[in-house]
Amino acid sequence: MDHRLSPELDELRRTVEAFAHDVVAPKIGDYYERHEFPYEIVREMGRMGLFGLPFPEEYGGMGGDYFALGIALEELARVDSSVAITLEAGVSLGAMPLHLFGTEEQKRQWLPKLCSGEVLGAFGLTEPDGGSDAGGTRTTAVRDGDEWVINGSKCFITNSGTDITGLVTVTAVTGRKPDGRPLISAIIVPSGTPGFTVAAPYSKVGWNASDTRELSFADVRVPAANLLGEEGRGYAQFLRILDEGRVAISALATGLAQGCVDESVKYAAERHAFGKPIGTNQAIQFKLADMEMRAHMARVGWYDAASRMVAGEPFKKEAAIAKLYSSTVAVDNAREATQIHGGYGFMNEYPVARMWRDSKILEIGEGTSEVQRMLIARELGLTP
């Protein structure tokens, strides 16, 4: 398989690389330390068309694909993951469900605003008692005439409480199967709907310039037409969304891993000890060689999964492999980058400190490492 980028994708990569270094890098540290959402940066990403990368032009998109999104995510995450996860969640979790499962009316209503970055969408799946048990949904939606009445709560929801958040698509139990198992459906809840409460932002270890909230629904009424896809198919729909999202998270994790290499190579050339740059020491060189090797192989993994996805081939196993490996690599490279920087790696003014804090969530969000191993084993034909 040829993993070299086409001229168009390489141009996109270079454009986002320049944006990340020229616009994001000088500003993001201050946003991060203030735990402040970077509206200025997000607006510029919208003007660049990044939120519309994988969507058709007829809905305001750029006419690209998921591979293009991955390229943008990797380049952003080489500099900062808060900005990258805002794009990832806005596209793969906020807008993609509407594109894949929405009615024509829903697409016309929401996608142009989502593709332009004027509005952010969010994905409400995880619940306080759920975690990896995504099927254990307790939020309910009861049909009352031409409306759904929603009650319940969601947690750890990215992009759900910004000033430009326009909607959250939530999963809710809408009935029971003959055997008693829940029928889970997906329903669009516009921001500001009465009874829909967004809590204050979480105080997080990392991703401090991104928006993450807990959501509560108390007799929230939305039109019956806000059902996304078929009733009872919400869980299956979001399993597909999560498969695709794992490829995007893998690209993001690869970017963080590569960013650790970038910063460490630069520091190793500048930092002198015992009369010479520390990069001349074999111990440092071997660390950097291993870090580059890991980042490179993580890139091969997500390129493979994304290539299969856009070609319409099965990619579930490859997505799980890419997500598992790249997130592990991100944590490993962040740890080694901090070690290479020594005491300075523990100081917040150095980007590697931010990368270290941001890396761990990649082994948890959008499917833990343990869940990825379960998925891989299942794809190998193994059952519990």
Each model region followed by its residue ranges:
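Long, acidic (Asp/Glu-rich), low-complexity accessory segments flanking structured domains
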Residues: A218-A236
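Short Ser/Thr-interspersed hydrophobic loop/turn segments at strand-loop and sheet-helix junctions
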Residues: G49, L73-A77, A172-V173, V189-P194, ...
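Flexible, glycine-rich active-site loops centered on histidine and acidic residues
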Residues: A95-F101, F123, G135
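Short Gly/Pro-enriched turn/cap motifs at secondary-structure boundaries
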Residues: L87, L114, D129-S132, T158-D163, ...
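A short, Trp-centered hydrophobic/proline-enriched beta-strand micro-motif
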Residues: G117-L125, V170-T171
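Flexible, small-/acidic-enriched active-site or ligand-binding loops
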Residues: G136, G192-P223
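Alpha-helical interface subdomain recognition
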Residues: M1-A89, F101-Q106, K113-E118, G131-A134, ...
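A short core secondary-structure module
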Residues: N151-T197
